[in-house]
């Protein structure tokens, strides 16, 4: 950064007024970031600078910057500053909707946001601030990671390892962590971004990978651009590595704010109640007709969820990954809840490996932040076939069952239609030998160890094959067993607390969530482990 060659820097012993002037001068140099040309390049790429991001994200005039004078300075023999390069990380604290957060982000205009131009004490300050004061941690990631030029400058190649991840992992067990992937991100910055409870990237503007296209091309011969290698189409729609996508940086900011609004400040607290004007005893008439009479016909599960929750507001996470399962946050009676449902429009709602992993992560997230869970179950079972077997679907499903079993937060389940087999046991898991999760049924409910069609084909195979008319005999057996699937019979055996009018779903769910509050407060301070991405 150019320095006025005629400027006489303040020295110890000189007047305080000159010291204050010097402080302001250094701060002004830091705010120039990488200079006008690099700022213009950032804007030409339709991206904000890190200082603009922080200003737009936080409440007006709420940002308190930490380390506003941090940078690499050089001085001559007379003690006058001759060079100054601002640090590539801007950090501090501020407010979102009046709530304190620790915040930091990479300055891509300086060395591409490389961590080698970030003072270690500065980069760790926001982590320590969030941990000590128990406030959410927000990071805007736009850094390229390690550079071979750094090795050459150092004169050696360092051995990876050490404890650089310790505080970030501790954060994941103590406070909410959210990250915006704001540009091309690789190496350690990518890993830090993924060590978050919520991640969002910008369509067409953000990419994330261990190494970028030049390294991939040299190592594997794959000729891909950044978007093909690690854009939103890859990591939001396919791999599930990133939770959500946004059309703009402003939308990404709003998603992060929405995510944080459902969580408490720490994992040892319960999210506060938010007042609203949606009556807890509201009876949505559409719930009575949302389920088709024909059991094989689909319906809109997101519409179902929005009809039940407060004001129809549902914050969905990982919509495109494991798409047969729906996960997200909402409120009932003003209280935050985790919501799980099935999408019959994707794999008929069956659990494949990706959906199982999605559930495992989400139930861990709800358990860590003491959110009761509301489940709208329409689970026909595990996805079948050779492709499902090659993806270790059942092993991943068992992991989901274990995660559900270990979760201590209470659950209420509405069996809106199908509930079959081990796959349905994941949300049904009671958590303890005498655990109690509340289960209700809708009139469309049907459940069992195996769907009738498949069960008949397996259990009655020889009888069917030996019949004069195998197809007619199979149909006869299926019709006989179909009479047994009436949810009335299950209710008579107390498989569910009750069969309910679907229009009463909201009222019952709100009663459950209110009932759960004292329990949540009692268990909130139990030890937590880092939520794994």
Regions found by a protein language model. Give the residues of each.
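Ligand-binding clefts of soluble mixed alpha/beta catalytic domains
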Residues: 1-533
